[in-house]
UniProtKB/Swiss-Prot annotation:
It is found in: Nucleus. This is Adr-2-binding protein 1. GO terms for cellular component: nucleus. Its main location: nucleus. Expressed in main body hypodermal cells, the hypodermal seam cells, pharynx, intestine and some neurons. Keywords: Nucleus. The lineage of its organism: Eukaryota, Metazoa, Ecdysozoa, Nematoda, Chromadorea. Required for the A-I editing activity of the double-stranded RNA-specific adenosine deaminase adr-2 by facilitating adr-2 nuclear localization. Residues 44-58 have a biased composition (Basic residues).
Amino acid sequence: MSFASGCTPVSFDKLFEVSSGDKVSRENWGMIARPEPQHDSLKRRNTTSSIAKKKAKMTRGDEQITDETARKAATQLLDQIQDTPGRISLNFETPEAASVCPIPTSLNQIVNTKWTVNQLQEGQLTMLLAQDANKFKSLGVKNIKKGSVETQILPRQMDVKEIVEKLKKQDNDSDQFVGYAAAVANVLRRCDAETAQKITQAITATIEKEAPSIVNC
């Protein structure tokens, strides 16, 4: 039996009809609705692909500000954070409005996250204004200030040279030398047993010589 003799002819109309029975032609191509998928995974795929992602809702409270100038400034800034995150433009018309919104150092890092303004008070936007004005330095624009963030390296993150240099540059009391002990401990962890023993013996001998009263107490 040949391959052709085992096939059943299919008409043009049957070949191009959809499951609902409608015929597809050049005139109605694309107009006939696709059949509703029966399988759950197909339904879920079609649904999720056609729905736009929802933006995180920002809780606002600028209407609670009683001062009109301050409220306009707060509303302007919140609108930008909500509508154009990452492109914040501070164009305040008056120095009074500018003084409402000092800008923290981390503003450029957190504008893309969800913003929540809670306990909004007159002249203060939570996360945008500082409680302590002394923590801000000037940006060069009148009444707009930027937060100053200092990074502190912990003693356990320093090596011995860094600790020694730090101790040379400032007046220190005995408590501040604890960082040196942490640095020495880091050295001992990295040494082999023989070297660590020599360092420990040298330090112990110095302690016994310089602070015998403490060793013996």
